[in-house]
From Swiss-Prot:
Name of the protein: Large ribosomal subunit protein bL21
Spans through the membrane: none
Subunit field text: Part of the 50S ribosomal subunit. Contacts protein L20.
GO CC annotation terms, alphabetical: cytoplasm; ribonucleoprotein complex; ribosome
InterPro entries: bL21-like, bL21-like_sf, Ribosomal_bL21
Function noted in UniProt: This protein binds to 23S rRNA in the presence of protein L20.
Organism of provenance: Metamycoplasma arthritidis (strain 158L3-1)
Lineage summary: Bacteria, Bacillati, Mycoplasmatota, Mycoplasmoidales, Metamycoplasmataceae
HAMAP family in alphabetical order: Ribosomal_bL21
Alphabetized UniProt keyword annotations: Ribonucleoprotein, Ribosomal protein, RNA-binding, rRNA-binding
Amino acid sequence: MFAIIETGGKQIIVKAGDTIFIEKIEGKEGDKVSFDKVLAINDKIGTPYLENAAVLAAIEKQGKAKKIVVYRHNAKSTHKRKLGHRQPYTRVKILEIKEAK
């Protein structure tokens, strides 16, 4: 059984037991979270979401991704700017997919 959920402005295909990386959500490690924006479960498709359907997950880790370097340079001048950015993420383990009866 698989489901398509929406979180952090992205759509993700998940199955029970999967570990996924998503945009940061509030909570501590070990907390349980529920994703209510379920777009589809197997062959059932919502308009846009399925009612009374949820995906239950547990937060495994809060962290930051690898640093990316942002470098800006203006031609014909000596202006340069170098920045780094680390995007926060949350690693969650999918526990259960609850389907509406």
